[in-house]
Regions:
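Membrane-embedded alpha-helical bundles of multi-pass transporters/translocases
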Residues: 2-457
């Protein structure tokens, strides 16, 4: 172990207050409420409200995805270089919520200008909003190992965060379109901008509430430390096998999750002729909240690695059960719920465990590059995996002869089954393989924490 830790933490093994836990969870309520509103309805707004062509709207969203894949590690480097009296991550919850709220709301305003001007405006406003969201989401993940060194407390905090995220999505799904109709009074353009402003105000307020109440450890020392050079940030990845294995597993998982969630509407519409079930199916996914809350209790008898692997295997099994359900709707709904319970657990675990990869890097190399390690392990995996998952789904269906807005051939229906069931199920199972090699590193967690506390004392 290196005798010099260039970015140190003091002992932080005590449990945090209920207020800090609630505040940490509120960050994901804030982020998901506003960002998911944009990601869910922006395409419809562009094409059916602003009048932008589908092809141009697709290019805008594709460019945003490309930028998303680039800006996550950049934000990680920025966080590693941040030095303030509030710490490394916490100040961003003061500096960014208002700009993020403003540009997210502006994304749902279409100025009365030429169509080319509208497209340029849409691209700029949406991309800036996406960049600012990454700027908030990256420190949200990176602050966890800076709040506490306790693996147990990190797991509890992460459960609060993931529950908050699900609440944010649930609130958005339940209120977005009713608010558009009510606030717009028949004018969709007015309805969307007023709804976006409403969500933006709530999001900004919740983020500032979290900023007020959460704390990083040892901010006085961090404030006066030299900034971590970019070269050393990347050096923290070298030989950090826990981090490498988690990044690989998490990236594969997000490809699978996005592919499954993107194609459920196609499966219900074309294979079962039950498009009316889409709202019900989407709302039932929130049942996973109950199991996310229970993760700290599972951890009392199971290693975190096995909880993550178990979630992936349950998600795989749920996919197989959906295939067996065929046109039995009750069986299908039960299998969908089961699959979402598994994916909900698997989605939660990386956020709780990436802090250990940061600790491992500090223990092994003497470099604690919290920002870039967690940016790659969380935000990059989510955004890149989601983009690849959507692309893979489209490629699979297209290769089987899928034709939009038409009755599908037998081959087209088979392609939807592969895109919705078999490819995600195989990828969920594949994501578990790197974790089989991770367990031996998790067994070192207490020793590493003790060594870091000794060095920093």
């Amino acid at each position: 172990m290196s005798s010099v830790i260039e970015d140190t933490q003091p002992s932080g093994s005590a449990s945090l207050s209920l207020l800090q836990r609630i505040s940490y969870g509120s960050l994901d309520v804030a982020g998901n409420l506003l960002y998911c509103f944009g990601s869910t309805y922006i395409l419809y707004f562009y094409t059916d409200v602003a009048g932008i062509s589908l092809a141009v709207a697709g290019v805008i969203l594709l460019l945003a995805r490309i930028i998303d894949g680039i800006d996550a590690p950049i934000w990680g480097i920025i966080i590693d270089k941040t030095r303030s009296r509030y710490g490394k991550c916490r100040p961003w919850f003061l500096w960014l919520p208002l700009p993020f709220a403003v540009f997210s709301a502006l994304s749902f305003w279409s100025p009365d200008i030429s169509m080319t001007g509208k497209a340029i405006y849409a691209a700029i406003s949406y991309m800036i909003a996406s960049i600012l969201f990454t700027g908030l989401n990256t420190p949200l993940s990176a602050i966890l190992p800076l709040m506490t060194l306790s693996p147990k407390e990190r797991l509890v905090l992460n459960s609060w965060r993931m529950t908050g995220g699900q609440i944010g999505v649930l609130l958005m799904n339940a209120t977005a379109l009713p608010l558009v109709a009510f606030l717009g009074n028949g004018d969709d353009h007015a309805g969307f901008i007023y709804t976006a402003i409403t969500f933006a105000i709530i999001s900004c307020a919740l983020t500032l509430f979290a900023f007020k109440n959460i704390r990083e450890m040892d901010t006085d020392k961090i404030q006066h430390e030299p900034k971590l050079p970019m070269k050393k940030s990347f050096a923290a990845m070298k030989g950090n096998w826990p981090w490498i294995l988690m990044v690989l597993a998490n990236l594969i998982f997000w490809i699978a999750l996005q592919q499954r969630n993107t194609t459920i509407v196609y499966y219900l519409t074309y294979n079962l002729d039950r498009k009316d079930l889409v709202p019900l199916i989407n709302s039932l996914a929130t049942i996973q909240i109950l199991f996310i809350i229970a993760i700290p209790f599972f951890s009392k008898s199971l290693a975190k690695t096995w909880i993550w692997v178990g979630g992936l295997l349950v998600a795989t099994f749920g996919g197989v059960m959906m295939w067996l359900a065929a046109d039995n709707i009750t069986f299908l709904i039960a299998a969908w719920i089961l699959g979402n319970i598994g994916s909900g657990i698997a989605c939660s675990m990386p956020f709780a465990m990436l802090g250990f990869a940061v600790d491992f890097g500090a223990w092994k190399t003497g470099i604690k590059a919290t920002g870039i390690l967690i940016a790659f392990g969380s935000t990059f995996c989510i955004k890149m995996g989601s983009g690849l998952g959507t692309a893979f789904a489209a490629w699979i269906m297209n290769s089987f002869g899928y034709v939009p807005n038409h009755a599908q051939s037998a081959a087209g229906l088979e392609g939807i089954i592969w895109a919705f069931i078999w490819a995600p199920a195989l990828l969920f199972a594949l994501a578990a393989i790197p974790l089989l090699f991770f367990r031996k590193y998790e067994a070192m967690e207490e020793k590493i924490r003790h060594d870091l506390e000794t060095v920093n004392s």
